Amino acid sequence: MTPIEPAHGLPKRVLIVEDSSLARLYYRNVLEGAGYHVDQAMNGLEGIEKALAEPFDLLIVDVNMPKMDGFSFLQLLRKSDSDAATLPALVITTEAESEDLQAARTAGANFYLVKPVSESDVRAYAAVLMGVRR
């Protein structure tokens, strides 16, 4: 699968905000294998710093993280005056309750997947969401 490229011809950039090193490695390998440039943050606070400092095309966000959870990360980012406030966000978590889905929507997620997720799902949702801005 070839990533959709912006007008300047560089690969699309994805920020993974996830505390699990294994999950970060999995998403990075899947997305880099599809031609995307990937950066990582270990929690919501680090994610905010990176999202506000560098241009990205997509956020992949876990919910349960130390220092700042994924919902708080998205809420804070969505309230910012930065271009990052409109980045599409894919929440991937182990939480499968309907109230978690509603909380993700309220926080500003564009889509919500429950772990475990397949490589094909990660690639497909990334490709679709990078064509969308909030």
Name these PLM-found stretches.
Residues 1-13, 20, 120-134:
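Non-catalytic signal-transmission and effector/linker regions of two-component phosphorelay proteins
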Residues 21-39:
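Two-component/phosphorelay signaling modules centered on CheY-like receiver
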Residues 54-60:
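Active-site beta3 strand of CheY-like receiver
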Residues 65:
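Receiver (REC) domain active-site loop signature in two-component systems and cognate sites
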Residues 110:
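Short, glycine/charged-rich "phosphate-handling" switch motifs in NTP-dependent
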Residues 115:
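A Lys-centered signature of the CheY-like receiver
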